[in-house]
């Protein structure tokens, strides 16, 4: 559970929101802080990207799909594991989807 703006938001044991509609951009920095991340514009770009990906495909992208999709949209400079791991050192797919209020990617351990 997470207290935010006077309401209780349900999370699973790993901190992922149980209901992605409870997410807001105001909540993202709180979720990021729990991951030890201070959101910068490059972080926001990835967070918004995974939210759009989820809305389009109804699934959270695992790392391979995230890298491939980011490369298609932003080019090789941002669509590579090294860049994404600099932003999300504990796992780009796991941390970005958590901060974006989405379910854990299916293929993430």
Curated annotation (Swiss-Prot):
Gene name tied to this protein: tusE
A matching Pfam family: DsrC
Biological role stated in the UniProt entry: Part of a sulfur-relay system required for 2-thiolation of 5-methylaminomethyl-2-thiouridine (mnm(5)s(2)U) at tRNA wobble positions. Could accept sulfur from TusD.
Subunit note: Interacts with the TusBCD complex. Interacts with MnmA.
Protein's GO biological process: tRNA wobble position uridine thiolation
Entry GO MF terms: sulfur carrier activity; transferase activity
GO cellular-component term (any): cytoplasm
EC number(s) reported in the record: 2.8.1.-
Protein name, entry field: Sulfurtransferase TusE
Main location: cytoplasm
């Amino acid at each position: 559970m997470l207290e935010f703006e006077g309401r209780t938001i349900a999370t699973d044991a790993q901190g992922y929101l149980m209901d992605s509609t409870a997410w807001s951009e105001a909540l993202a920095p709180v979720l990021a802080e729990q991951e030890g991340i201070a959101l910068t514009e490059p972080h926001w770009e990835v967070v918004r990207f995974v939210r759009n990906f989820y809305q389009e495909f109804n699934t959270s992208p695992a790392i391979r799909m995230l890298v491939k999709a980011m490369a298609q949209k932003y080019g090789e400079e941002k669509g590579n594991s090294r860049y994404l791991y600099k932003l999300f050192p504990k796992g780009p797919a796991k941390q970005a989807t958590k901060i974006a209020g989405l379910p854990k990617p299916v293929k993430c351990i």
